[in-house]
Every structure is written in C-alpha cells, then in structure tokens.
C-alpha cells in the first residue's frame, strides 16, 4: 500500500527585506510566481494533499499556488511566532493522519522533487525526522547539521556553535520530513524558551530523539536550496534557473549560439535541432518546433513556430501568433493573434494582427492590418498565394481572395475577390517643369528673408 503524504508549504512571511507591496512568493521567476515553482516540485513527489500556510496577500498566494493536479488548502497564520508555529497553523490537515509530512518553503523556487523523495524514503526506512541539508563552501550563518554514526544529533545555530561545529559545512536548508503519525505530538512539544520567544521547527530533532525516535539528514544540491529574501537574490535565482533550463534544452538537441543571452519562460518548449540566436526572449506559452530558426533580438510570447519556419531578427510574436512550416516573419515585424500559412512571408516592417495569411502569400514591407476601430477588434483574411504590395493598409474587417494582388500603397477597405488586382490609392500625375517653379519660388522667399536682416 502506498504511503500517504501531506506537504505543508510555509508562505506567510512578511517579506520585509524584499521591499515590496506584495508577498515575496508572488514575485516571478521565469514568468511564474516562485510559489508555483515550489508547488510543481511538490506535485512531482506523489503527495496526497497540500496545506499552504499564508499570511500577507493570502488570497493571491493561494491562487498562485493552485497549479492544478493537487488539492491545496490554505491556512492563515495570524501571528509570526516561528516555523514551528507556522506548521501548526495547518493542524487540521495534520490531524487527518498522513504517513508522511513534508515541510517546504514558498521561497525556494529552484527546488526539485529529488530531495523531497529522498526525505520520504528516509521516513519509510523508519526515521521520525528527516532534515534536508546541503554542503556549502560558505556556511556563514546557516545552522550546522551535527551527525554521528549516520544519525542527526542536532541542528546547531551558528551563533551557538563551537569552533569545531562551525567547521561543519553540511547545513540546514529548513526543509524536512516528519513521521505523520507522530507529527502533532512532536510539534506540540516545541517550546518557545528562547531569546525571540518563537517556536522553532528545528527543535524537532532533539525532541524526537528524547522520545526514542531517530533523526537523519539527506543531502541536496546547494543550488536547489537557495532561498529568496531580497531583489538581489531574486535576480540571482533567476540567473540560476535560466542556466539550468538552457543547459537542459541544449542537452536535448537545441542549438543556442550564446546561451547566456537567451531568456526562457517556465513553460517554454523548444524542439530538437531548433536554432536560437543571441538575445532572444521567450515569454510564457511558447512552443518552438524542431528545426525552427529564431534569429537574434526577437521577443516571443504565447506563440507557436512550426519546424522550418524562421523568425526575426528583431521580430515580435505576441499571443496567438502561429507560424506554419516554412513561413517567415522577418525584421521589425509584429504578429498578434495571426496565423501565417505554410511558406507565407512577412519579411519587413509589418504589423499582422487578428489575421490569417494563406499558404504561399507574400506581405510587402510596411503592410499593416488595421484591426482596431477604437472600440472593437476586427479580422483580416488573406487567401493563399496572394501578393500584398508594400506600404498597404488593410482595414478590417476585410477578405482578400486566393491569388489576388494588392497594389503598393493601397488602403483596402473592401473585399478583394480571388485573382483580382486591387488599387486603393490616388492615381499618379506628372506635371512637367513644375518642380523648377516650386524650387525657384522657395529660393526667392529664402533670399527675401536674408535681405530683411
């Protein structure tokens, strides 16, 4: 029979060092609130339920933590009286009697399921407390994990440690797993006889041992345990996240010429043999198929780029952009909610919004779809193998048929049938010698002005 597990995520801190009007766990990493990153790692740990301990921005934090797939209940911590007190805010959930309890924090967005699974295995092996630790070259103020014969004896805070204990480089991350059947009894024994009058979760190690239980520590990569308390650490974590994800994509077959200049979102999908040139930014909900080419300085969000399609340089794809095989969106072009058909080309200086472009069509430089009338958006439909001349304005709603031509500089306000040629501009007139008259008059005016000074 599988063991049941409750995950308790502590996210009630005041976030004072973040200097922000919102809780720090709502700040994004790779376009997603950091609490959602934590929840994703927890969801991969085969848990039964999750209890979210909230304080500031309680409703917003609860909403951000609801990533789907797991049941999340929010519990309000009215006072900030330490980590032990925070865990007991979820007393109702703990009392349901799970086999395992995992305690995690909402501000460790680089967390993966691997150390959480290791902690659960430690409980399955008969331990009552399993602390997740990490080795570091700079232990500084971290609590030290004191281990003897494979058993965790205590967690010693740096300010209370001896010189020998300060030499220990295995440190407490704050994350731990607790025997769920004993959890309430152990948690209720935590006292607050300390300088701050708070209830510390770390006391569980010695409490469990005093009752004949056993505590151990398991190791995790230091990077996964990186917490966020201020904007500098937020930027540092963003960098670490980006480095990790870029590396994963390159190992999967994606080419990045200058990976350090490419920025990904939490859900960016890029297929094998895609080429990403320098200085490309991906927002959420982007899928790049195998073989696509994204040229330098492009910004892509909410878009799909099929294989053999090319984007950029200096292109922007906004939500709803969908490029078919062999299509091209070139330099200084923007596509929003636009479907670009197979082999179609939007090469230069164009805006395509709320539009469909048929296979093989060519959109000339400077063409725009005029999709907004000041109140509502309207659609433009261009058929297959059509040619839109440069500097044309297509005023939606409008349809242009297959194999149609639109003359350069046209303003198109009515539908154009298939195979038709449409002009939407004044006819050119040539007046011989008129330029000379205009120039001489202008020069005379200029000379008169000089003479008056």
From Swiss-Prot:
Annotated binding of UDP-N-acetyl-alpha-D-glucosamine, by residue: 10-13, 24, 77, 82-83, 105-107, 143, 157, 172, 229, 318, 336, 351, 362
- The record's free-text note on cofactor binding: Binds 1 Mg(2+) ion per subunit.
The biological pathway it contributes to is: Nucleotide-sugar biosynthesis; UDP-N-acetyl-alpha-D-glucosamine biosynthesis; N-acetyl-alpha-D-glucosamine 1-phosphate from alpha-D-glucosamine 6-phosphate (route II): step 2/2; Nucleotide-sugar biosynthesis; UDP-N-acetyl-alpha-D-glucosamine biosynthesis; UDP-N-acetyl-alpha-D-glucosamine from N-acetyl-alpha-D-glucosamine 1-phosphate: step 1/1; Bacterial outer membrane biogenesis; LPS lipid A biosynthesis
Q: Which domain of life is it from?
A: Bacteria
Q: Where in the cell is it found?
A: Cytoplasm
Q: Which NCBIfam families match?
A: glmU (TIGR01173), PRK14353.1 (NF010933)
Q: Where does acetyl-CoA bind?
A: 365, 371-372, 390, 408, 425
One GO cellular-component annotation of the UniProt record comes to: cytoplasm
Annotated source species: Rhizobium rhizogenes (strain K84 / ATCC BAA-868)
Cofactor names from the entry are: Mg(2+)
In the record, what terms sit under GO molecular function? glucosamine-1-phosphate N-acetyltransferase activity; magnesium ion binding; UDP-N-acetylglucosamine diphosphorylase activity
InterPro entries tied to this protein: Bifunctional_GlmU, GlmU-like, GlmU_C_LbH, Hexapep, Hexapep_transf_CS, MobA-like_NTP_Trfase, Nucleotide-diphossugar_trans, Trimer_LpxA-like_sf
The catalytic activity of this protein is classed by the Enzyme Commission as 2.7.7.23, 2.3.1.157
Keywords attached to this entry:
Acyltransferase, Cell shape, Cell wall biogenesis/degradation, Cytoplasm, Magnesium, Metal-binding, Multifunctional enzyme, Nucleotidyltransferase, Peptidoglycan synthesis, Repeat, Transferase
Record region (Linker): 232-252
Give the catalytic activity: alpha-D-glucosamine 1-phosphate + acetyl-CoA = N-acetyl-alpha-D-glucosamine 1-phosphate + CoA + H(+); N-acetyl-alpha-D-glucosamine 1-phosphate + UTP + H(+) = UDP-N-acetyl-alpha-D-glucosamine + diphosphate
Q: What is this protein called?
A: Bifunctional protein GlmU
Q: For the region Pyrophosphorylase, what residue ranges are annotated?
A: 1-231
A Pfam family:
Hexapep
Q: Which family does it belong to?
A: In the N-terminal section; belongs to the N-acetylglucosamine-1-phosphate uridyltransferase family.
Share what the entry says about its subunit structure, partners included: Homotrimer.
Query: Which residues hold Mg(2+)?
Result: 107, 229
Give the gene symbol: glmU
Region N-acetyltransferase: what ranges?
253-453
**Principal EC category:** transferase
Q: Cite the active-site annotation.
A: 348 (proton acceptor)
Role description: Catalyzes the last two sequential reactions in the de novo biosynthetic pathway for UDP-N-acetylglucosamine (UDP-GlcNAc). The C-terminal domain catalyzes the transfer of acetyl group from acetyl coenzyme A to glucosamine-1-phosphate (GlcN-1-P) to produce N-acetylglucosamine-1-phosphate (GlcNAc-1-P), which is converted into UDP-GlcNAc by the transfer of uridine 5-monophosphate (from uridine 5-triphosphate), a reaction catalyzed by the N-terminal domain.
């Amino acid at each position: 029979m599988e063991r049941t597990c409750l995950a308790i995520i502590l996210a009630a801190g005041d976030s004072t060092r973040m200097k922000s009007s919102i809780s720090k766990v709502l700040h994004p990493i790779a376009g997603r609130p950091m609490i959602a990153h934590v929840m994703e790692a927890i969801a991969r740990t085969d848990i039964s339920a999750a209890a979210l301990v909230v304080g500031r921005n309680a409703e917003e934090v609860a909403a951000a933590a609801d990533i789907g797939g797991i049941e999340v209940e929010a519990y309000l911590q009215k006072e900030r009286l330490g980590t032990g007190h925070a865990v007991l805010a979820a007393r109702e959930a703990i009392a349901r009697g799970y086999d395992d309890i995992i305690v995690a924090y909402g501000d460790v967005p680089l967390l993966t399921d691997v150390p959480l699974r290791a902690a659960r295995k430690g409980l399955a092996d008969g331990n009552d407390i399993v602390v997740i630790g990490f080795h570091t070259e700079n232990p500084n103020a971290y609590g030290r994990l004191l281990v003897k014969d494979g058993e965790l004896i205590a967690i010693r805070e740096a300010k209370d440690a001896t010189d020998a204990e300060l030499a220990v480089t295995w440190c407490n991350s704050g994350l731990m797993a607790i025997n769920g059947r004993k959890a309430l009894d152990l948690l209720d024994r935590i006292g607050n006889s300390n300088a701050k009058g708070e209830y510390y979760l770390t006391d569980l190690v010695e409490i469990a041992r005093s009752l004949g239980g056993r505590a151990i520590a398991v190791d995790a990569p230091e990077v996964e345990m990186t917490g966020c308390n201020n904007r500098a650490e937020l930027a540092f974590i963003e960098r670490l996240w980006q480095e990790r994800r870029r590396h994963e994509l390159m190992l999967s077959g994606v080419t990045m010429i200058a990976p350090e200049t490419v920025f990904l979102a939490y859900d960016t999908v890029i297929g094998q043999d895609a080429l990403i040139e320098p200085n490309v930014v991906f927002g959420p909900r982007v899928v790049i198929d195998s073989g696509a080419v994204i040229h330098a300085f492009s910004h892509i969000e909410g878009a799909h780029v099929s294989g053999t399609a090319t984007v950029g340089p200096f292109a922007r794809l906004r939500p709803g952009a969908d490029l078919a095989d062999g299509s091209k969106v070139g330099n200084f072009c923007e596509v929003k909610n636009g479907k670009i058909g197979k082999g179609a080309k939007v090469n230069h200086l164009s805006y395509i919004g709320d539009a469909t472009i048929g296979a093989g069509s060519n959109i000339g430089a400077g063409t725009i779809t005029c999709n907004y009338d000041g109140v509502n958006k309207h659609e433009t439909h261009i058929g297959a193998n059509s040619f839109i001349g440069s500097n044309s304005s297509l005023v939606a709603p409008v349809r242009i048929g297959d194999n149609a031509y639109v003359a350069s500089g046209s303003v198109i306000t009515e539908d154009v049938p298939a195979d038709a040629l449409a002009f939407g501009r004044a006819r050119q007139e040539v007046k011989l010698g008129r330029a000379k008259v205009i120039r001489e008059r202008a020069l005379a005016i200029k000379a008169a002005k000089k003479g008056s000074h």
